[in-house]
Amino acid sequence: MGHSMLSHFIQVRCLSPDQEITVQDIMSRVFYRLHGAIASLHTSDVGVSFPNHTFMSVGDVLRVHGSKDALTRLLDGGWLFRLEDYTLSSGIISVPEQVKYRCVSRARAKSSAPRLRRRLMRRHNLSELEAKRLIPDSIEKRLNLPSILVCSKTTSTPSYPIFIKHGPLLSSPVPGPFSGYGLSSEATVPWF
């Protein structure tokens, strides 16, 4: 998959209309809806970026990258339905000529306590209580990366953070597939 597959983008700015709901809450809802739309289209050619990200926040803007056709299918699916009061969407725009590229990927903590407990329970036939006693929450190492709190459309897992890692800027695109979240550990998205 070449850069031509990511020739267009949709920019979604998340708004915080009142004190009740934060920009990060809106971003979580937008990202969750996008995940559902990507999953329902069974596609791996849609990537995301967070151009206003900071050290600990993904920021208020989500860019969705893809071909004009892929983005049209996404919009036709109505993934921003009922979020219009909380977002400003650009519609489909061509990527500018002079851009850099970067990988926007999911990062996972190596020492997730729930994951280690499940493995311990499976391998040693322990109860959840025994596993919790052996592996307390305090062993977790927090990632110093921005995250989005989501619940999965494809599994019944409760809400969990997805940590977002922005790779170095590159002068050439790197092809590859994107996950159901629009993230990839190998493929790049246009960065501008």
Predicted feature locations:
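Long, charge-dense
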Residues: L75-R119
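Short, charge-patterned binding micro-sites
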Residues: G47-V58
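Glycine-rich, aromatic-bearing surface loops/beta-hairpins
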Residues: R142-F192
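Structured alpha/beta or helical-core interaction and ligand-binding surfaces enriched in interleaved
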Residues: V61
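Short, hydrophobic/π-rich interface segment
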Residues: A109-I162
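Flexible glycine-/small-residue-rich
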Residues: C14, G66, S152
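N-terminal ordered "arm"
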Residues: S4-S49
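Helix N-cap motif at beta-to-alpha junctions
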Residues: V64-L71
